[in-house]
């Protein structure tokens, strides 16, 4: 102790020698650092806590605890100790939060490579590379056979392209370790080229790469567990990794309460599509060695396929994996490979000598099941269907007789004998796999004889009124549901007939086009039937197979729903069809129309329905009804193009690039005159004088409105050129004959810095105007039309802008500063909208309807605003007059039409010529305007010739051959097409909704102005000229109606556009009055009529909801919303509560949304006969008789 004390003293004085003032104090109280250092020198142990505790408990004497100053002991550092006991830094909790907050989803990725796994076949991967998104925690795994640079580069290219295309995101940072596979020059250049920052871990700091390391460890734990549980061989290890990744991406995190898929905006995992890893299944062998070989191969389910809607299944007997949907789950506890003796699965050679006739083992209900499951079969079932099968002559005929009363589980001796010689039984087989599962049961529904077919053409589905099931006492159908495959893996016995209660309900699929009557089965019964799915055998048709026994396809509805349906359909302007006499179904090959060898690629880009004229004796559109000179019916693509699944390639057009550039430079149609044309060089003295008068009137109005600062003129050189706006006078003659002049700014060359790009100039939507007019007719409203003179000049301008003075001042070198929003400026429309909106709200007591700009209302008046035009609707004319008085206090307001007469009043509202008799009718047309404008288009009209009775002919196809014209001619023809289609579009969307299909189709060919396209456009203009007197007719709704009824009638023409696109159309009606329509090409490629119909309906729902809100705001009566379609399968899908996964995720999303709309927003969906579907005119060209029949009740 003395030695230690002496050493301590010497050490203390040595340590404090640089600080003489503290020597005396240290002698009284020892510094903790000195004490610790002394222990280090003597004992090489700096533990100050132990030293302090020892002094306190007197295990070390000479010093007391109070003799030492412990204040700086914690912060003391000993270099030798730090060197001797150096460790890695501790993990800082929450250290990655800054990355999560700084980056958007898919911008920061973690990656790591695992491997190699030894003793595997060459075909099996030895490595895998994983990626994890920092924000969403979504994970990806990719197999690798090696760690070469090109292999890693391929994976990086794949993942980056996937994220860019699927999530519209760009990866910014990728964190990885310092392995050579990541630090090589090839990958570094690739990342640098794509603007991605590589973030490497520091040396020997694997914990900094914890996200990727932990993921690999978790996936490997899952892999080992799955392989152990399933008993599958080790070379399937990556399949277990992929299965685990799918599951882990779908499980919610305890911290965020969401799964990685939810964070990424993806739908949740449909558990019904996921099977346990290693689940025993039987896979259909679509390519057997012979017709008598078994069709099933035992296998094990691994994971859902990445590249299809199928499942990856391992087939031990073939030593390979397959991607298929044709499998059946084996229900049993055994899941090991030793369950089957695959060596015993050999076939008796004697069976090859059997020559019995072979009949189809596939019945029509198997095809329906395939459609219902939303799967694609590897086998063409249609080729095995026989409409009139002969009586089977082989030994199996007795076993499948529909009149046999033997229970389904029993078989004849012959069938047993055949089954015993077919295959040697495995050593250990699931008890459910028996002859009753392999061979068809005796009581099977035979393939029905078609008694009636109603084809809807391309606008709907093919409806087969076919009894797919025999009478209840004679049929027992084994079905399988793909959605229930993973719900019950226990043994399940066969069910008996008395356990079921069949009710005919429509079952449909997203991808199919057939709507058939099949039994409704309970959930418990479905689980029992899962394992019994087996093909049916065609047999003789039942005796009573007539239309009288057919149960009609009808979704159950309540009495109130039926009343609602009757109420909705009663007011619609649907055609009256004469009763049809029953007709027999003709021989399918008797009345096939001839095929024209000169068929081209598209029918007017779609004019000429792909399915409308190829269906035999189509009730929807009969060839006998076609009064045109059409002699041929054709498909969308010609016969030679149908040899390939791919659409024909588009042909090149001469001068394509130059033509596109030329289109951009084409000037719009100019209907006005410049100053020199109207005044300076105008040789018409009378017209010149009128324009001069209009010129001075405009100048006086500008000065009156204090449009610019008249006190000071600015030198042009002193002003920033970008703030100088060119100006000009334009002159035109209005429809009423008056001559007008307008001083405008050249906003087309205005600099972007001189206006706020975020401001919007709003005008009333045409649907809002049509809705307001319809409500005015039903409620006996007065309609008052106003005009505000020089409306824009009432709005102040905030920016500093200058213009040249008008020509008559003769001050070309000077500038004047604007104070008002001159016509033509980019911001003028927005400034005026904000000005008048503020005045109507504050001074007139109005409020703007949310979501419908320029529609204002209060308790008495509704106002629709279109720039300087105002339309007022009110039950009390005095309320309109009160608004007018308030407006006149601030604005120069002209009353165009007060609307006080009880007789017919004529209006000219936004181009529509309206005839309105309050409480009776309203007629909307454009006869005067079309009579004036159409002759000016230089179209060879035939005013004295025979009038066209339809806007286009079915079967006329646009030839997409090369366009051999020069640049100047191309510009001229495109300019002409712009004029013609522009006017047609204006008229079509105003009120001629029956022309929208032709207008939309021809508009797609504006940049392809071939002679044929121009001729078809001329024909459309000629039809508009011949029918220019047609009007949209509205009649007042019944006064007893308590509700407003808003209906959308939808239709789709499947695949009648180039590249298999479909044409969709919708017509909107309010209280039986057509207020709008739309015809357009579907944005997605549909694979069936049902998908096309779903797409059409989904396009109508948003506008239907918006219109519903507007109507409720303008009129307080309750509203009923309805959707009408001629596709029963679509209605079945929308009304179904089945949660099965759809074959296509895009249409699945649309269908699920429609279900939500129907169930949550009081939206009624009803069926309408195809012959009464007036939306048919929106999707395809129709024969004259059909076109007239569908349109004569609402436009004539």
UniProtKB/Swiss-Prot annotation:
Free-text function comment from the UniProt entry: Reverse transcriptase/ribonuclease H (RT) is a multifunctional enzyme that catalyzes the conversion of the retro-elements RNA genome into dsDNA within the VLP. The enzyme displays a DNA polymerase activity that can copy either DNA or RNA templates, and a ribonuclease H (RNase H) activity that cleaves the RNA strand of RNA-DNA heteroduplexes during plus-strand synthesis and hydrolyzes RNA primers. The conversion leads to a linear dsDNA copy of the retrotransposon that includes long terminal repeats (LTRs) at both ends. Integrase (IN) targets the VLP to the nucleus, where a subparticle preintegration complex (PIC) containing at least integrase and the newly synthesized dsDNA copy of the retrotransposon must transit the nuclear membrane. Once in the nucleus, integrase performs the integration of the dsDNA into the host genome.
Ranges for domain Reverse transcriptase Ty1/copia-type: 779-917
Binding-site positions, Mg(2+) 2: 787, 868-869
Organism (species): Saccharomyces cerevisiae (strain ATCC 204508 / S288c) (Baker's yeast)
Motif interval(s): Bipartite nuclear localization signal: 619-653
Entry's transmembrane regions: none
Record GO biological process: DNA integration; DNA recombination; transposition
Keywords carried by this UniProt record: Cytoplasm, DNA integration, DNA recombination, DNA-binding, DNA-directed DNA polymerase, Endonuclease, Hydrolase, Magnesium, Metal-binding, Multifunctional enzyme, Nuclease, Nucleotidyltransferase, Nucleus, RNA-binding, RNA-directed DNA polymerase, Transferase, Transposable element, Transposition
Catalysed reactions, as listed in the record: DNA(n) + a 2'-deoxyribonucleoside 5'-triphosphate = DNA(n+1) + diphosphate; Endonucleolytic cleavage to 5'-phosphomonoester
Residues the record lists as binding Mg(2+) 1: 112, 177
EC number(s) from the headed UniProt entry: 2.7.7.49, 2.7.7.7, 3.1.26.4
This protein's name: Truncated transposon Ty1-A Gag-Pol polyprotein
Anything else known: Retrotransposons are mobile genetic entities that are able to replicate via an RNA intermediate and a reverse transcription step. In contrast to retroviruses, retrotransposons are non-infectious, lack an envelope and remain intracellular. Ty1 retrotransposons belong to the copia elements (pseudoviridae).
PROSITE patterns per record: INTEGRASE (PS50994)
């Amino acid at each position: 102790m003395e030695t230690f004390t002496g050493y301590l003293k010497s050490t203390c004085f040595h340590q404090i020698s640089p600080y003489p003032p503290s020597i005396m104090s240290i002698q009284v109280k020892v510094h903790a650092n000195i004490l610790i250092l002394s222990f280090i020198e003597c004992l090489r142990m700096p533990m100050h806590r132990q030293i302090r505790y020892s002094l306190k408990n007197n295990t070390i004497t000479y010093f007391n605890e109070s003799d030492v100053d412990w204040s700086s002991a914690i912060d003391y550092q000993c270099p030798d100790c730090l060197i001797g006991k150096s460790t890695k830094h501790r993990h800082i909790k929450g250290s990655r939060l800054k990355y999560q907050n700084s980056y958007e989803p898919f911008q920061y990725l973690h990656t790591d490579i695992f491997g190699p796994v030894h003793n595997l076949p060459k075909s099996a991967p030895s490595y895998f590379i994983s990626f994890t998104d920092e924000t969403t925690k979504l994970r990806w795994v990719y197999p690798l056979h090696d760690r070469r640079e090109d292999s890693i580069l391929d994976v990086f290219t794949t993942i980056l392209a996937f994220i860019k295309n699927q999530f519209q995101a760009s990866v910014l940072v990728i964190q990885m370790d310092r392995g050579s596979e990541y630090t090589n020059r090839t990958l570094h250049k690739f990342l640098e080229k794509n603007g991605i920052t590589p973030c490497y871990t520091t040396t020997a700091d694997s914990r900094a790469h914890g996200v990727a390391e932990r993921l690999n460890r978790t996936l490997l734990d899952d892999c080992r567990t799955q392989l152990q549980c399933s008993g599958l061989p080790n070379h399937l290890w990556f399949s277990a990794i992929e299965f685990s990744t799918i599951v882990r991406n779908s499980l919610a995190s305890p911290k965020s309460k969401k799964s990685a898929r939810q964070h990424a905006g993806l739908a949740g995992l449909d558990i019904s599509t996921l099977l346990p890893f290693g689940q025993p299944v039987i896979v259909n062998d679509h390519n057997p060695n012979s017709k008598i070989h078994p069709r099933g191969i035992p296998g094990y389910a691994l994971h859902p396929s990445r590249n299809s809607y199928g499942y990856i299944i391992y087939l031990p007997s073939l030593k390979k994996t397959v991607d298929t949907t044709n499998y059946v789950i084996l229900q049993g506890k055994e899941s090991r490979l030793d369950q089957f003796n695959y060596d015993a699965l050999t076939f008796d050679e004697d069976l090859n000598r059997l020559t019995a006739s072979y009949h189809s083992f596939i019945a029509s209900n198997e095809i329906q099941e395939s459609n219902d499951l939303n799967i694609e079969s590897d086998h063409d079932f249609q080729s095995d269907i026989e409409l009139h099968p002969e009586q089977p002559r082989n030994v199996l005929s007795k076993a499948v007789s529909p009149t046999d009363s033997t229970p389904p589980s029993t078989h004849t001796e012959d069938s047993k004998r055949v089954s015993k010689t077919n295959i040697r039984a495995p050593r250990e087989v699931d008890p459910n796999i028996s002859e009753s599962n392999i061979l068809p049961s005796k009581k099977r529904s035979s393939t029905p004889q078609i008694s009636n077919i109603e084809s809807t053409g391309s606008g709907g589905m093919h409806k087969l009124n076919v009894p797919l099931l025999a009478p209840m006492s004679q049929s027992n159908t084994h079905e399988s549901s793909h959605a229930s495959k993973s719900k019950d893996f226990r043994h399940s016995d066969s069910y008996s007939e008395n356990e079921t209660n069949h009710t005919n309900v429509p079952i449909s699929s997203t991808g199919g086009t057939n709507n058939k009557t099949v039994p409704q089965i309970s959930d418990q019964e479905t689980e029992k039937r899962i394992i019994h799915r087996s093909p049916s055998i065609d047999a003789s048709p039942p005796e009573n197979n007539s239309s009288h026994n057919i149960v009609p396809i009808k979704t159950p509805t309540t009495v109130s729903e039926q009343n609602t349906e009757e109420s909705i359909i009663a007011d619609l302007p649907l055609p009256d069809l004469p009763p049809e006499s029953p007709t027999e179904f003709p021989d399918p090959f008797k009345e096939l129309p001839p095929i024209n060898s000169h068929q081209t690629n598209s029918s007017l880009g779609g004019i000429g329905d792909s399915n409308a004229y190829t269906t035999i004796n189509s009730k929807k559109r009969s060839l006998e009804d076609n009064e045109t000179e059409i002699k041929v019916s054709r498909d969308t693509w010609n016969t030679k193009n149908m040899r390939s699944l791919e659409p024909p390639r588009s042909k090149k057009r001469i001068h394509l690039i130059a033509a596109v550039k030329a289109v951009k430079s084409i000037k719009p149609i100019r209907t006005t005159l410049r100053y020199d044309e109207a005044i300076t060089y105008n040789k018409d003295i009378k017209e010149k004088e009128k324009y001069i008068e209009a010129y001075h009137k405009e100048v006086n109005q500008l000065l009156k409105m204090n449009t610019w600062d008249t006190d000071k003129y600015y030198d042009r050189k002193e002003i920033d050129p970008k703030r100088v706006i060119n100006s000009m006078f334009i002159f035109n003659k209005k429809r009423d004959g008056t001559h007008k002049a307008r001083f405008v700014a050249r906003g087309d060359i205005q600099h972007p810095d001189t206006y706020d790009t975020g401001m919007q100039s709003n005008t009333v939507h045409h649907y809002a105007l049509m809705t307001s007019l319809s409500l005015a007719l039903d409620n006996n409203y007065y309609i008052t039309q106003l005009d505000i003179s020089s409306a824009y000049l009432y709005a102040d301008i905030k920016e500093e802008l200058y213009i040249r003075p008008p020509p008559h001042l003769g001050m070309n070198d000077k500038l004047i500063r604007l104070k008002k929003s001159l016509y033509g400026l980019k911001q003028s429309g927005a400034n005026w909208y904000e000005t008048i909106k503020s005045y109507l709200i504050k001074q007139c007591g109005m409020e703007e309807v949310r979501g419908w700009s320029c529609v204002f209302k209060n308790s008495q008046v509704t106002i629709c605003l279109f720039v300087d035009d105002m339309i007022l609707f009110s039950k009390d004319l005095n309320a309109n007059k009160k608004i007018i008085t308030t407006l006149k206090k601030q604005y120069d307001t002209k009353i165009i039409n007060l609307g006080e007469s009880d007789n017919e009043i004529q209006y000219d509202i936004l181009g529509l010529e309206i005839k309105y008799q309050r409480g009776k009718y309203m007629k909307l047309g454009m006869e005067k305007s079309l009579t004036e404008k159409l002759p000016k288009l230089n179209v060879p009209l035939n005013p004295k010739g025979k009038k066209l009775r339809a806007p286009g002919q079915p079967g006329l196809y646009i030839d997409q051959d090369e366009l051999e014209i020069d640049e100047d001619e191309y510009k001229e023809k495109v300019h002409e097409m712009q004029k013609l289609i522009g006017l047609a579009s204006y008229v079509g969307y105003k009120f001629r909704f029956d022309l929208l299909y032709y207008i939309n189709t021809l508009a797609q060919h504006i940049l392809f102005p071939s002679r044929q396209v121009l001729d078809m456009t001329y024909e459309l203009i000629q039809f508009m000229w011949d029918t220019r007197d047609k009007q949209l007719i509205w009649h007042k709704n019944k006064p007893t109606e308590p509700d407003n009824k808003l209906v959308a009638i939808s239709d789709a023409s499947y695949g009648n556009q180039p590249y298999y696109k479909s044409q969709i159309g919708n017509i909107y009606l309010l209280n039986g009055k057509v207020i709008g329509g739309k015809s357009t090409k579907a944005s997605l490629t549909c694979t069936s009529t049902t998908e096309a119909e779903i797409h059409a309906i989904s396009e109508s729902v948003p506008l239907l909801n918006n219109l519903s809100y507007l109507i409720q705001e303008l009129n307080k009566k309750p509203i009923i919303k309805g959707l009408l379609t001629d596709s029963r399968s679509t209605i079945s899908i929308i009304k179904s509560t089945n949660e099965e996964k759809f074959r296509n995720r895009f249409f699945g999303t649309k269908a699920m949304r429609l279900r939500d709309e129907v169930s949550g927003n009081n939206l009624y969906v009803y069926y309408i006969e195809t012959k009464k579907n007036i939306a048919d005119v929106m999707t395809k060209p129709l024969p004259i008789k059909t076109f007239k029949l569908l349109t004569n009740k609402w436009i004539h």
